[in-house]
Amino acid sequence: QTYFKHHAIDLHYKVHRAMEVDKDISKVETILGELKQLGAARNEPILIVGGGVLADIAGFAAALYHRNTPYVMLNTSIVSGIDAGPSPRTCSDGYGYKNLFGAYHAPILSITDRSFFKTLHPGWIRHGIAEIIKMGGVKDLALIELLEAAGPDLVRTAFGTVATEPGSEIDGLSKQILGLALKSYVE
């Protein structure tokens, strides 16, 4: 909010819980209604700040709103940073089926700021590591080697954002791992 105020940008925002159980078409409809209520224009980019579920449902809402409204994704979790956030696949669950509704609508920009990782529960850090292991096993064994080199320090330091100095070994390994995982995803 401070950034937008400093740059005299009119900011309207909504807060949504975005757990896996919330990844439903009704949440997409809610977001669509809010965009209409706020008077968001078709070509006015929407800023989405959140994790993987929000990337999926808010990205899908952007795809539907006036047929492909642009959006910027600011990723706050590891999974959204390396998978859901930059992905052109947007979706929601419906009628008891996972990812029943969807559209291809990539963000115009996807940003991952590791400083958000310090707010994550260790379970969410491990979830991100599991996603990276999957990528490494399928495509790039260097990811597995980097994960082994970092060891439990990845969880303890939330990918180099807690109790560590910039430029430290874990800071460097964290950046390498995230960069290589994102590269692996994009390729």
Where are these regions (language model features)?
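Short, structurally constrained coil/turn elements
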Residues: 5-7, 40, 65, 94, ...
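Loop/helix-junction capping segments adjacent to catalytic residues or to phosphate/diphosphate-binding pockets
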Residues: 21-25, 55-56, 119
